[in-house]
Amino acid sequence: MTIIRKSHPLIKLVNHAFIDLPTPSNISGWWNFGSLLGVCLVIQISTGLFXSMHYTSDTLTAFSSVSHICRDVNYGWLIRYMHANGASLFFICLYFHIGRGIYYGSYLYMETWNIGIILLFMVMATAFMGYVLPWGQMSFWGATVITNLLSAIPYIGSDLVEWIWGGXSVDKATLTRFFAFHFIXPFIIAAMAMVHLLXLHETGSNNPLGIPSDADKIPFHPYYSFKDLLGIVSLLSFYLTIVLFFPDAMGDPDNYMPANPLNTPPHIKPEWYFLFAYAILRSIPNKLGGVMALVLSILVLAMFPFLHTSNQRGMMFRPISQAXYWXLVSDLFILTWIGGQPVEPPFIIIGQLASIFYFSIILILLPVAGXXENKLLKW
């Protein structure tokens, strides 16, 4: 008689994905972020579910319902701050996960990579809609500014914006539909994450050396299940430190003021995890050009498999590519800083230069570095 985990149709799926899965024996801590993203998603769905039980998606009561959650609901403050900071944690893990993929050449698994890019867009859209729900000043004005960008699309732009708003401005209809979409999207993200995993398990995991590892595979459980558990405990301790000691560190103080369509805040800016893209958007004086740069700043990830020129997969033994990679990471930090600054000198020119460097490193420097390293190694 076979073991139930190998014969039962449902348990067999779990077994192939998380128990008997053959895994490279040398994958490092950078491979932990996939499971951490799964944990983040579970945290966000569960805290969001409890927060939605007390939230009302009406312009008159949305702000006070969030206040009510924090003041009157048992542990409501904890649920609300776990959900708000969970989004930041989600993006920290996401950016590490993508950074690992770029560094070690994981983008050569094209199905997995492209599904990952779709997932990134979905998570960004969901986070943006969630930021609108508390109906504070930055929620309202962020929603107005970002949705208004669609009006830059020729011919259909202004109609499209009014269609999304459900009226002549961001109002009750907008808030209600954003709540509906914000609720459903994480479940779609969870389903897409399963597809992401399915595509990955067709090829098997990459590893730090970037070489085939069929000759040296070990079962996922117990080795990597416990390694993931260590990552999860570390993540949760960091997460709870933020939630319990610095709950407002990631947020904007303007969002503690109820939305007022008659009073524009002096600096409208999104949450910190969108600031790099916001800086790229603002670096182009033309509206349509800015919107295109904004979309391309994420979509450029899809170019990585086609721009891979090196005969080695990862950057582990490629110092020139490493230099360009870390310059890209530094550039993203600079863009994040600029995104939070007002549009005035010297920030304008810094943002424009950082945006040019961002695209130049990805589209020119990394492929050139790869080709140069091939030449140096006489490959």
From Swiss-Prot:
Q: What is its main location?
A: mitochondrion
Q: What is the organism of origin for this protein?
A: Perognathus flavescens apache (Apache pocket mouse)
Which InterPro entries did the record assign?
A: Cyt_b/b6_C, Cyt_b/b6_C_sf, Cyt_b/b6_N, Cytb/b6-like_sf, Cytochrome_b, Cytochrome_b_C_euk/bac, Cytochrome_b_N_euk/bac, Di-haem_cyt_TM
Q: Other notes on this protein? A: Heme 1 (or BL or b562) is low-potential and absorbs at about 562 nm, and heme 2 (or BH or b566) is high-potential and absorbs at about 566 nm.
Taxonomic lineage of the native organism: Eukaryota, Metazoa, Chordata, Craniata, Vertebrata
A Pfam short name: Cytochrome_B
Necessary cofactors: heme b
Which SUPFAM superfamilies does the record match to this protein? a domain/subunit of cytochrome bc1 complex (Ubiquinol-cytochrome c reductase), Transmembrane di-heme cytochromes
Q: Where do the annotations place heme b b562 binding?
A: 83, 182
Protein name, as recorded: Cytochrome b
| Domain of life according to the entry | Eukaryota
